[in-house]
């Protein structure tokens, strides 16, 4: 009897509510302090367990499947190798999040793959063990595996659960691809923001140390942020290109979205301190 498809595994986007760069480490990575919060806008994945070890990926987004270095496939392969599981999976990705915009979609897809297949393959790794696999694939992946809003330090892997307010956001995705590597290699990037205690950081105005540099180099980001600042406190997430404005009411965010210039793409989403992936785990 063929295996059933396990459907509707969410891979939520994240926002960096602040992002501070505290210096460059000896290994070349940057020391960061950042605050992650999920939003209720997600990619969706379906999985079918197979008896043979092949890993097959389908997607509604052209170009995703052709990439053999795809994080979804690398995550599944890493779980196979770590556990010795000799079966495989067929995976369907419904890509809804903008790619390469600082929303963490690729990392979230990989995290959902690890969490879902760990359950469906009955490999029984702990959350910490899954996070260790994820960290080898990308610094953002552990926060999606743990599934709670978090203050992060190091390269982003040391996590402390936090409970910020859950406002509504208007997220704009400018028509620009910002290379994270280029941003972190740029000599003009500020790298000397002092490390502060979490209580201090949570109580002061929030900022993104990458924003000034990216805005200066990408006019599309500058234009989107300038427009959004007329309606709400706004800043960039990650290394961009996406920017977000914060609203207390959904209706306020929707009213601003209705005025969005036709050349810009945007959506309204609510902040979530608990990932919908954790909720999905409790279902068959």
UniProtKB/Swiss-Prot annotation:
Keywords: ATP-binding, Isoprene biosynthesis, Kinase, Nucleotide-binding, Transferase. InterPro entries: GHMP_kinase_C_dom, GHMP_kinase_C_sf, GHMP_kinase_N_dom, IspE, Ribosomal_Su5_D2-typ_SF, Ribsml_uS5_D2-typ_fold_subgr. Pathway: Isoprenoid biosynthesis; isopentenyl diphosphate biosynthesis via DXP pathway; isopentenyl diphosphate from 1-deoxy-D-xylulose 5-phosphate: step 3/6. It catalyses: 4-CDP-2-C-methyl-D-erythritol + ATP = 4-CDP-2-C-methyl-D-erythritol 2-phosphate + ADP + H(+). GO terms for biological process: isopentenyl diphosphate biosynthetic process, methylerythritol 4-phosphate pathway; terpenoid biosynthetic process. The active site is at 14, 140. It holds the Pfam family GHMP_kinases_C. The keyword Thylakoid does not apply. Catalyzes the phosphorylation of the position 2 hydroxy group of 4-diphosphocytidyl-2C-methyl-D-erythritol. This is 4-diphosphocytidyl-2-C-methyl-D-erythritol kinase. It comes from Shewanella baltica (strain OS155 / ATCC BAA-1091).
């Amino acid at each position: 009897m063929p295996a059933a498809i396990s459907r509707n595994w969410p891979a939520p986007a994240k926002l960096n509510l602040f992002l501070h760069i505290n210096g460059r480490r000896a290994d070349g990575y940057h020391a960061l302090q950042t605050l992650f919060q999920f939003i209720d806008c997600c990619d969706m994945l379906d999985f079918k367990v197979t008896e043979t070890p092949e890993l097959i990926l389908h997607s509604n987004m052209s170009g995703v499947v052709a990439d053999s270095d795809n994080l979804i496939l690398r995550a599944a392969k890493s779980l196979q190798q770590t556990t010795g599981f000799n079966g495989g999976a067929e995976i369907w990705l419904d890509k809804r999040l903008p790619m390469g915009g600082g929303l963490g979609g690729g990392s979230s897809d990989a995290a959902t793959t690890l969490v879902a297949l760990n359950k469906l393959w009955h490999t029984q790794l702990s959350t910490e063990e899954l996070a260790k696999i994820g960290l080898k694939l990308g610094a953002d992946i552990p926060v999606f595996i743990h599934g709670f809003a978090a203050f992060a330090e190091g390269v982003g892997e040391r996590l402390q659960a936090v409970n910020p307010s859950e406002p509504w956001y208007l997220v704009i995705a400018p028509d620009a691809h910002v290379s994270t590597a280029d941003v972190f290699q740029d000599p003009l990037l500020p790298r000397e923001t002092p490390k502060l205690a979490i209580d201090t950081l949570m109580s002061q105005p929030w900022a993104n140390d990458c924003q000034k540099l990216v805005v200066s180099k990408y006019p599309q980001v500058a234009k989107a942020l300038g427009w959004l600042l007329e309606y709400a406190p706004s800043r960039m997430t990650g290394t961009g290109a996406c920017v977000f404005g914060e609203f207390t009411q959904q209706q306020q965010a929707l009213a601003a979205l209705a005025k969005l210039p036709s050349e810009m793409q945007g959506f309204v989403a609510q902040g979530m301190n608990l990932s919908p992936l954790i909720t999905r785990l409790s279902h068959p």
